[in-house]
A protein has these predicted regions:
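Anion-binding and metal-coordination hotspots
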Residues: 1-248
Length: 248
């Protein structure tokens, strides 16, 4: 039996806990991440607002997404880097190789170079793969006599590392992850999760009444409006009570 599901995606102001924009998408990671670009562009176009930082989970930590935030939008990504380079077989991960920006090469723990231009082509090539990576290869001669071969590339003649063309953005995100501001963003992310919990438990929006993407968007937009009004009413009541106490 076919099953159709939609997800609501919020762009919120973490300080005020106000929902700034809403986007309905099919319930899969690719569409949900893409909705973030849509909402950020739409809010900037309509209201001339652009976030200084964006907090999210690992789904938003892909190389292309990080490059878009840092290089195109100048937004600090407070998200974990989506990194699959760590190895689980006790062999050396790519993070244990030192990157030399000037030489455009990696250096292994024993000091040998991994370069992207070892294979010579008659016609110049960009060397960028379909996965938006560049392959850096060690010399087979260096690897054959290396004392660390069993820990580095036991099943291949030489070591290879795939480096993303957006690796600079990934490195910048890793640097941000070590800052106090990043830790604060991780704590504040629960504000978003609370809105989703309120959506299901209080507003009972666990089943949509309208059909199709347009219907889902309308229902999610109305629900977000109700949440914003509820939040604004609480703030107005709190401000009124504080004013009355001050007068008294």
């Amino acid at each position: 039996m076919p099953f159709f599901a939609y997800s609501t995606n919020y762009l919120i102001n973490l300080q005020a806990r106000i929902i700034v924009d809403v986007e309905a998408t099919p319930a899969n990671r690719t569409h949900e991440v893409e909705s973030t670009r849509t909402m950020i562009d739409r809010v900037e176009r309509r209201h001339d607002l652009k976030p200084r930082r964006l907090a999210g989970d690992t789904a938003y930590g892909s190389a292309a997404m990080l490059a878009w935030m840092i290089q195109e939008k100048e937004i600090a990504p407070h998200v974990p880097v989506w990194d699959k380079t760590a190895r689980k077989d006790n062999t050396l991960s790519s993070s244990e190789f030192k990157w030399d920006e000037l030489a455009n090469e990696y250096r292994c723990p024993t000091g040998h170079a991994l370069r992207s231009d070892r294979r010579k082509f008659r016609n110049p090539r960009s060397r960028v793969t379909k996965a938006d990576t560049i392959i850096y290869r060690a010399s087979q001669f260096d690897c054959e006599g290396c004392s660390m071969k069993d820990r580095c590339c036991p099943n291949t003649p030489f070591r290879k590392i795939a480096r993303s063309i957006h690796e600079a953005a990934r490195d910048e995100t890793r640097r941000i992850a070590k800052t106090p501001e990043y830790n604060r963003s991780c704590r504040e992310r629960k504000k978003v999760e609370m809105l989703f919990a309120h959506l299901k438990r209080i507003l009972k929006l666990d089943r949509l009444r309208l059909r199709g993407p347009s219907g889902a968007h309308d229902e999610f937009l109305m629900a977000a409006t109700a949440q914003n009004l509820r939040r604004m009413a609480k703030r107005l009541m709190l401000g009124s009570q504080q004013m009355n106490q001050a007068v008294a």
